[in-house]
Swiss-Prot record:
Organism of provenance: Methanococcus maripaludis (strain C6 / ATCC BAA-1332)
Gene Ontology biological process: amide biosynthetic process; glutamyl-tRNA aminoacylation
Enzyme class: ligase
GO CC field: cytosol; protein-containing complex
UniProt keyword annotations, A-Z: Aminoacyl-tRNA synthetase, ATP-binding, Cytoplasm, Ligase, Nucleotide-binding, Protein biosynthesis
Summary of the function given for this chain in its UniProt record: Catalyzes the attachment of glutamate to tRNA(Glu) in a two-step reaction: glutamate is first activated by ATP to form Glu-AMP and then transferred to the acceptor end of tRNA(Glu).
InterPro entries given in the database record: aa-tRNA-synth_I_CS, Gln/Glu-tRNA_Ligase, Glu-tRNA-synth_arc/euk, Glu/Gln-tRNA-synth, Glu/Gln-tRNA-synth_Ib_cat-dom, Glu/Gln-tRNA-synth_Ib_codon-bd, Rbsml_bL25/Gln-tRNA_synth_N, Ribosomal_bL25/Gln-tRNA_synth
Location in or out of the cell: Cytoplasm
Intervals of motif 'HIGH' region: 100-110
Gene assigned in the entry: gltX
GO molecular function: ATP binding; glutamate-tRNA ligase activity
Entry EC number(s): 6.1.1.17
Record's protein name: Glutamate--tRNA ligase
Catalytic activity: tRNA(Glu) + L-glutamate + ATP = L-glutamyl-tRNA(Glu) + AMP + diphosphate
Disulfide bond residue pairs: none
């Protein structure tokens, strides 16, 4: 690993004339070496170690070492082909489903299930059903029905059929009635606390022994609204080792008006009943779900067995641990209503809309979720891996510009006006050049110190004379880069004060970073990707009268 890291850091250091950018190097290391993406912590430790070695080398020594480590150039090794994930027991046509609750738009946690279902149905030429599980009226956000489908379209997930559970209540009633008639379910009017105490002891409640005929009468009264505070329970094993499986509920009364049905219905199925009926009737062959649903799988198998239905192939994958942005839909919604968040695409949120606004490309997220796959072990979501995959997508089209954040004005004496031409992209000459015109006054981001020498990138060396009233006064020293190296001068980027363009960059914490970009930044359009050198990749969001608004995508 050390030689690999060393090679990438050397390449980066040489590119920036002896001042390596470890974050940029990390992105390229992970982007071009997928086997290292699960070892981010170790890679960071090696980077810290290698940086100390590189700091002692001259540029010539760095180049010699790079030639030794990668004589044919980086990224030339043949990448070992990753074994493609597969489904077990594929017989005939594959049918799968993605089944979110329409309580809000999709977030990054939903991306795994939606992408993997899409991946497998495309791989096996199968069918993907989007099932909107909206039988809990209290959790439904009306606009989410459309938002979810928009999110899936953006992600590249192809849906063949859309099912809305609140439109299928009569179907669930039919199968609920059949379970009661067969003696596998009963109407229970026990107090919730009373039933819970009995269940914990493995003791059946008084309602369990009622005949199917008696239960059908109560069922009809439930539907007609003649009774309240009752539920339908499925008969399981009252002595089951897991108390939650003992006679779990499959229907309950809910008087909250539904966004789609209003008050037309008040008896609603619970998840384990509606999911099982739908999976059977829609012909699901394989069901992907988190391992936190293993107990639900066992509950649903009771219903499959009572009806004599074929049980689909269940695949339970590990939990995807995502740190950072807010993922709780209820917290996001509350924050939007209170004004804490600007909307569902606020940069602090983990929604797909927020990722999209920041500049994450769907193909990068899709690729990463397929790589994470269906392993049963829990997985930590590594943002570094997403950023590396995203950089692979956007880097080739991202024009380069200088951006000066928190700008400090520098007045330089003793230097002639000068024009320099820089390429818009180091590897794509067809994207053209950009022009910087030095006329004695520039902006820099760095805090400069009096008496020290600095190298202005692609220009010359200066020495700071004094700082007065927040203006830095410096004088021209020399053109030679070797002089800067011998004086251990920091290499800093800059832009001319004249014609500079105000830019606000919104970061992942929704903080505004104010600064200026060079004049040729004016060629960009909405949704363009740009790399602000030594700052990071940004997505251009909009042009305003006083400048541009961009979102920080990643470093």
């Amino acid at each position: 690993m050390k030689d690999t890291v060393m090679a990438y850091l050397l390449e980066n250091s040489i590119k920036f004339k002896g001042k390596p950018n470890p974050k940029a190097a990390m992105g390229k290391i992970l982007g071009e070496n997928p086997d290292l993406r699960s070892k981010v912590k170790e890679v960071n430790e090696v980077i810290s170690e290698v940086l100390k070695e590189i700091e002692t080398m001259s540029l010539e020594e760095q180049q010699a070492k790079l030639d030794e480590l990668a004589p044919e150039g980086l990224g030339q090794k043949t990448e070992r082909k990753r074994k493609e994930i597969e489904l077990k027991n594929v017989k005939g046509n594959v049918a799968m489903r993605f089944a979110p609750n329409p309580s809000g738009p999709l977030h990054i946690g939903h991306a795994r299930a939606s992408v993997l279902n899409d991946f497998f149905t495309k791989k096996y030429n199968g069918k993907l059903v989007l099932r909107l599980e909206d039988t809990d009226a209290k959790r439904v956000l009306p606009e989410a029905y459309e938002m979810i489908q928009e999110d899936l379209n953006w992600l590249g997930v192809k849906v063949d059929e859309v099912i809305v559970q609140s439109e299928r209540l009569e179907i669930y009633y039919e199968y609920g009635r059949k379970l009661i008639e067969m003696g596998h379910a009963y109407v229970c009017d026990c107090d919730a606390e009373e039933f819970r105490n009995l269940r914990e002891q493995g003791i059946p409640c008084k309602c369990r022994d009622a005949t199917p005929e008696e239960n059908i009468v109560l069922w009809e009264k439930m539907l007609s609204g003649e009774v309240e505070n009752v539920a339908v329970r499925l008969k399981t094993d009252i002595a089951h080792k897991n108390p939650s499986i003992r006679d779990f509920p499959i229907f309950r009364i809910e008087r909250t008006p539904h966004p789609k049905n209003g008050t037309k219905y008040h008896v609603y199925p619970l998840m384990n009943l509606s999911v099982t009926v739908d999976d059977h009737l829609l012909g699901m062959t394989h069901v992907l779900r988190g391992k936190d649903h293993i107990v639900n799988t066992e509950k649903q198998e009771y219903i499959y067995n009572y009806f004599g239905w074929e049980i689909p192939e269940y695949i339970h994958y590990g939990i995807l641990k995502i740190e950072g942005p807010v993922l709780s839909t209820s917290k996001m919604h509350a924050g939007i209503l209170s004004g804490e968040y600007s909307g569902w695409d606020d940069a602090r949120l983990g929604t797909l809309r927020a990722l999209r606004k920041r500049g994450i490309r769907p193909e990068a997220l899709y690729k990463l979720m397929v790589e994470i796959g269906i392993k049963q072990a829990d997985v930590r979501f590594a943002w570094e891996n997403l950023y590396a995959a995203n950089k692979d997508v956007i880097d080739k089209d991202a024009r380069r510009f200088f951006f000066v954040e928190s700008p400090k004005k520098v007045v330089i004496s003793g230097a002639e006006n000068k024009k320099i031409d820089l390429r818009m992209h180091p590897d794509r000459s067809e994207l053209g050049n950009r022009e910087l015109l030095f006329d004695g006054e520039i902006y820099v981001s760095d805090d400069l110190e009096a008496g020290k020498m600095y190298r202005l990138m692609e220009l010359f060396n200066i020495v700071v004379e004094r700082i007065e009233n927040d203006i830095i006064y410096a004088k021209y020293d020399s053109d030679d880069l070797a002089v800067a190296k011998s004086n251990r001068a920091s290499i800093i980027h800059w832009i001319p004060v004249k014609d500079s363009i105000p830019v606000t960059v919104i970061d992942e914490n929704a903080e505004n970073i104010e600064g200026f970009a060079e004049k040729d930044f004016a060629v960009v359009k909405k949704d363009d990707f740009v790399q602000f050198e030594r700052f990071g990749f940004v997505r251009v969001d909009e042009k305003e009268d006083n400048g541009y608004i961009c979102y920080l995508t990643h470093k």
